């Protein structure tokens, strides 16, 4: 066992030989958009992301389905499954089957098995003092999804969030591999602050980030100001606040955005200063949605985060 659950990492990694290791993960959730096909795409991309965060490539998947068969037609489920299958195919993975149950609320996701060379595993314990922190997607999907459920999200915000959530992290993982990245995690349900904190704790380091350097989706600040904040995001902020020192200039809305629970978020990468420019160039070349240096890893209390109000590291 190369990676287990003890470090709160994104997936398990099991060595099979000197040249090959398996990556195993699973994820599923309820719909966050209205369109069934798009929901399937997002759920699949979200599950596949854990394999990319570990430096691997997906091979096989199993569907996980909960469906209210007496309330919603099965052809609608077919659209969910089509979205998932086509997204898995884009990742080079095959869906081999799965399991479904009758459920009062629809749910969909995947079990994913991938592979990685044992010497090329990226983990959330790989950050080192001096590393630059790079984010590969804008944040804010939780806020937009909450606004969608209330019918309050504008077309531009919906389009931007949907594009982000349906984008695979494969190209970002390729760029990370090219730059020799060893520290990585994907930003999902615990938000940027939560996943960064877990990475820092696992690595035995602390970090300083700049709120203004963190990319965010179109219209997120306005939607957050209007109160479209999920309960999970508030819990994320409560938890993160125990180990995070915020610049007094950052208001509660800004802090909530940084703690926003993400779905199919980007990769958070820790890269050496010497390789930071190579990584951001590779991300740009691979057409990553973002290639933002948002902070620096440092020595100090493991898991401790300092958030500055500036727009860039100084």
Task: Give the location of each predicted region.
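A generic local secondary-structure boundary/capping motif
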Residues: 1-3, 11-14, 49-52, 85, ...
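Active-site glycine-rich loop that binds ribose-phosphate moieties when present
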Residues: 111-121, 156-177, 250
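Alpha-helical scaffold segments that flank or form the walls of functional sites
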Residues: 38-54
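Glycine-rich anion-binding loops of enzyme active sites
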Residues: 16-33, 38-41, 57-153, 192, ...
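Glycine- and other small-residue-rich loops at beta-strand/loop junctions that grip anionic moieties
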Residues: 2, 99, 125, 136, ...
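Acidic-glycine-rich active-site phosphate/pyrophosphate-binding loop
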Residues: 12-23, 166-172, 237-248
């Amino acid at each position: 066992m190369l990676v287990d659950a003890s470090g709160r990492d994104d997936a398990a990694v099991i060595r099979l030989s000197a040249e090959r290791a398996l990556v195993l993960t699973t994820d599923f959730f309820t719909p966050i958009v209205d369109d069934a096909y798009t929901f399937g795409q997002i759920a699949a991309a979200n599950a596949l992301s854990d394999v990319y965060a570990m430096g691997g490539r997906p091979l096989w998947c199993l569907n996980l389905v909960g469906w209210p068969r007496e309330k919603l037609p099965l052809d609608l489920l077919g659209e969910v499954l089509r979205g998932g299958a086509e997204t898995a195919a884009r990742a080079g993975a095959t869906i081999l089957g799965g399991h479904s149950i009758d459920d009062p609320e629809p749910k969909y996701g995947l079990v994913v098995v991938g592979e990685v060379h044992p010497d090329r595993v990226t983990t959330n314990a790989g950050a080192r003092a001096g590393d630059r922190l790079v984010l590969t997607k804008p944040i804010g999907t939780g806020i937009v999804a909450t606004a969608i459920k209330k019918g309050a999200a504008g077309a531009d915000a919906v389009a931007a969030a949907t594009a982000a959530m349906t984008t695979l992290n494969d190209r970002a993982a390729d760029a990370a591999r090219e730059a020799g990245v060893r520290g990585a995690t994907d930003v999902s349900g615990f938000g940027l602050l939560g996943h960064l904190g877990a990475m820092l704790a696992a690595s035995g380091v602390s970090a300083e980030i700049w709120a203004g350097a963190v990319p965010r989706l179109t219209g997120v600040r306005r939607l957050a100001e209007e109160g479209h904040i999920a309960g999970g995001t508030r819990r994320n902020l409560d938890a993160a606040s125990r180990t995070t020192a915020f610049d007094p200039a950052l208001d509660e809305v800004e802090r909530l955005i940084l703690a926003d629970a993400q779905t199919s978020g980007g990769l958070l990468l820790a890269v050496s200063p010497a390789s930071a420019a190579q990584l951001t160039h590779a991300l740009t070349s691979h057409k990553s949605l973002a290639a933002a240096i948002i902070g620096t890893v440092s020595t100090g209390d493991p898991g401790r985060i300092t958030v500055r109000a500036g727009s860039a590291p100084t």
